Amino acid sequence: MAFQISPGVNVSEIDLTAIVPAVQTTAGAFAGQFRWGPVEERVLLSNESDLVSTFQKPNGTYFKDFFVAANFLAYADTLHLVRINNTGLVNANANAATILVKSEEDYDNNYSAGISGGGQFVARFPGALGNSLKFSICASNTAFESTLTGTCTVVNGNNGITFSANQETKLTKGDRVLLGPDNDVFTIHSVATGGKSAVLTASYTGNTVNGVAAPTRQWEFYNFVTRSPGTSAWASTRGGTNDQMHVVVVDEGGDWTNVKGQVLEVFDAVSKASDAKNEDGSTNYYVDAINRRSKYLWWAGHASGLSNAGSAAAGKAFGGAIKPDTQSFASGSDGSAGTAGQYQTAYDKFKSSEEVDISIIMAGSATAPTANHIIDNIAEFRKDCVVCISPEQADVVNNSGHTNAEVDDIVEFRNALTSSSYGILDSGYKYQYDKYNDQYRYVPLNGDVAGTMARTDEIR
């Protein structure tokens, strides 16, 4: 076969039908800032759907890192990704507490016995997205359904309701109240101090009713569970009582589903008993059920009304509040923009070739110091991978500082990089459509370059 002894273009014909791709695909690695997901922990992703379900959709602040990862996954199916621990990350909670639970490992090692100041639950991962969540606990038969004392009055076309007796101990926001001769369902928006009046979420339509006796109220999520919480078969055979409870997780703000009030998860008839089991042998203890199955919550502590919660079932009379415990999350924070040091710490998760097998590292929108850190401390150390780097956005996007400014600035950026056979520098940024926010974005090219390299490995 002829070969070239000077630079030129060589044209080859290759029959790809005879190529058998290697079983092991070319793995990429990346660290970035995201709205959700585990922090400082390697996560293996296979496609963009995995990326969205684990780290959530991009917004106007965190889109560059998202699309670098997404663009790589458009070509390849193996990406190890680490979310950086940027300053100010906070898990949303109902107690306005500053809490950071970074990952499942962090929870198991430091918080599985409870989270001081966290209330009953905290958001599973840090980020403002958690502020859209609320939870509701129904821990007793009375909280599920009860009869209000005294009488009530409702007027056609009015959203107010008055009571002859104080209902504060029985009625709470979100409760359903059955009104009128047909027991039409109306929802409580708020209960006045003193409990003798309340506001409905919608005006009452029907005949004005004066002095209706003992109206029925129900838990907000009455129709989402099979029955009132009572005693499970597990507790009953061991002499325990009233161990069952229901927990519902809701997208109150609509940030997860675009539907405010959408129910996300239902934990039906879970148990307050620490040793409770289902018929199939799986745990039914509410703490374990939520920690193992929820995508949105970690358990933080037992509510004060859950008497004997966390005890074994034998001989225990478990208790629960007489009205639902429904709380909205707040205080979750995305934090500030990540620093070079925080990105470098995240990239260090790829330093050991014994812990993770990678071939290409994407630098994203990294500055020269971070790109050098990746080359010098990871690629040069491992000697089995390369780093794909893009110049800074200001070097190549709307750079009109002077004639040939883009070329000069790219050269300056290159000269700030370590000279290494493990580094690859591309030409800049791409302008691509963000389908999640209906906008066009400038995104570093290194995700695409790394992706085409991985794809070439697969088909060649």
Please state what every model-predicted region is.
Residues 1-147, 151, 164-460:
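A glycine- and small-residue-enriched flexible loop/hinge signal that marks low-structured segments
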Residues 156-162:
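Short, structured beta-strand/loop micro-motifs enriched in basic residues and often containing a Trp
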